[in-house]
Swiss-Prot record:
Gene: fabI
Catalytic activity: a 2,3-saturated acyl-[ACP] + NAD(+) = a (2E)-enoyl-[ACP] + NADH + H(+)
EC number: 1.3.1.9
Protein name per Swiss-Prot or TrEMBL: Enoyl-[acyl-carrier-protein] reductase [NADH] FabI
Active site (catalytic residues): 145 (proton acceptor), 155 (proton acceptor)
Upper classification of the organism: Bacteria, Pseudomonadati, Campylobacterota, Epsilonproteobacteria, Campylobacterales
Residues the record marks as site: Involved in acyl-ACP binding: 203
């Protein structure tokens, strides 16, 4: 018997079969969940529908989180098709490319507002819209990153957005706790995804994480997906308001091992020159 057998969940923001949302969806499906998916626009619909089909789901809905009317349509569609939900996965983040270049000082008000609206407010609006459909014991999960609390090169305004997102998780956990609904964030280590492709020097970031993380590796999509499934299932019934790291332990590190520093410096300089 799967940990999510008989449960119904909504996956918001899956982009392709390399995305973290896909890894979570696949793990939930393997544990017996019935899934529904959203897509941003017609271009991404062509990617999402095959994923939904692979995971035996006929439920695919359009959702541009910048459009209020889409939330209303989503609510009506889910109520009609599924009746209720046991979990929501929020995997939505965006900042204009120019806001990830240069320094934070150069961030425009427009780029800042866009990053906050799409990456943070969308979680609040999504949860509030679908709250009447959430069953007792339901779970809401969003995706964060270490850049929320530590400086990460080329992350800029997204670091601020992820910090705000994690704060929203804590406040939503309190607001929804009285309804026995849990809210958590999953903070994964670097993984090659469509979103990470927009970050400069990402190959170097991957290698740096691999050689400095306590487990001396980068995490896999399956590992992150299984952690997400845990936070959505009854296995984590006592967990809410948490930021759960799945990064091979990298978040605990200060400096790497002294005996390795020379090799690391040479390796990273070589990687940097290849960019």
């Amino acid at each position: 018997m799967g940990f999510l057998k008989g449960k119904k969940g909504l996956i918001v923001g899956v982009a392709n079969n390399k995305s973290i949302a896909y890894g979570i969806a696949q793990s939930c499906f393997n544990q017996g969940a019935t899934l529904a998916f959203t897509y941003l626009n017609e271009s991404l619909e062509k990617r999402v529908r095959p994923i939904a089909q692979e995971l035996n789901s006929p439920y695919v809905y359009e959702l541009d989180v910048s459009k209020e009317e889409h939330f209303k349509s989503l609510y009506n569609n889910i109520k009609q098709d599924l009746g209720s939900l046991d979990f929501i996965v929020h995997s939505v983040a965006f900042a204009p490319k120019e806001a990830l270049e240069g320094s934070l000082l150069e961030t425009s008000k427009s780029a800042f507002n866009t990053a906050m609206e799409i990456s943070v407010y969308s979680l609040i609006e999504l949860t509030n819209t679908l709250k009447p459909l959430l069953n007792n014991g339901a779970s809401v999960l969003t995706l964060s990153y270490l850049g929320s609390t530590k400086y990460m090169a080329h992350y800029n305004v997204m670091g601020l957005a992820k910090a705000a997102l994690e704060s929203a998780v804590r406040y939503l956990a309190v607001d929804l706790g009285k309804h026995n609904i849990r809210v958590n964030a999953l903070s994964a280590g670097p993984i090659r995804t469509l979103a990470s492709s927009g970050i400069a020097d990402f190959r170097m970031i991957l290698k740096w994480n691999e050689i400095n993380a306590p487990l001396r590796k980068n995490v896999s999509l399956e590992e992150v997906g299984n952690a997400g499934m845990y936070l959505l299932s009854s296995l984590s019934n006592g967990v809410s308001g948490e930021v759960h790291f799945v990064d091979a332990g990298y978040h605990v590190m200060g400096m790497g091992a002294v005996e390795e520093k020379d090799n690391k410096a040479t390796l990273l300089w070589d990687l940097h020159k290849e960019q």
